[in-house]
Amino acid sequence: MRCLPVLIILLLLTASAPGVVVLPKTEDDVPMSSVYGNGKSILRGILRNGVCCGYKLCHPC
């Protein structure tokens, strides 16, 4: 009978524990969506400002 409370406590603890091992994020863990969004905003800025071909001739897109 002494084992029953211990067994119940262990069952409650294992049920509330996360099923996946959670690792802390490092600086190398960059989500792909932010990389894609940064590239998109850079391209949008280039296209909005116009493209210069190296000479004095610049044309907007």
Swiss-Prot record:
<keyword id="KW-0732">Signal</keyword>
<keyword id="KW-0528">Neurotoxin</keyword>
<dbReference type="InterPro" id="IPR031565">
    <property type="entry name" value="T-conotoxin"/>
</dbReference>
<feature type="modified residue" description="4-hydroxyproline">
    <location>
        <position position="60"/>
    </location>
</feature>
<keyword id="KW-1015">Disulfide bond</keyword>
<dbReference type="GO" id="GO:0005576">
    <property type="term" value="C:extracellular region"/>
</dbReference>
<feature type="disulfide bond">
    <location>
        <begin position="53"/>
        <end position="58"/>
    </location>
</feature>
<protein>
    <recommendedName>
        <fullName>Chi-conotoxin MrIA</fullName>
    </recommendedName>
</protein>
<keyword id="KW-0379">Hydroxylation</keyword>
<comment type="function">
    <text>Chi-conotoxins inhibit the neuronal noradrenaline transporter (NET/SLC6A2). Activity has been described on both human (inhibition of norepinephrine uptake is IC(50)=1.26 uM) and rat (pIC(50)=6.21 corresponding IC(50)=0.16 uM) transporters. Acts as a reversible non-competitive inhibitor.</text>
</comment>
<dbReference type="GO" id="GO:0090729">
    <property type="term" value="F:toxin activity"/>
</dbReference>
<dbReference type="Pfam" id="PF16981">
    <property type="entry name" value="Chi-conotoxin"/>
</dbReference>
<keyword id="KW-0964">Secreted</keyword>
<feature type="propeptide">
    <location>
        <begin position="20"/>
        <end position="48"/>
    </location>
</feature>
<feature type="signal peptide">
    <location>
        <begin position="1"/>
        <end position="19"/>
    </location>
</feature>
<feature type="disulfide bond">
    <location>
        <begin position="52"/>
        <end position="61"/>
    </location>
</feature>
<comment type="similarity">
    <text>Belongs to the conotoxin T superfamily.</text>
</comment>
<keyword id="KW-0800">Toxin</keyword>
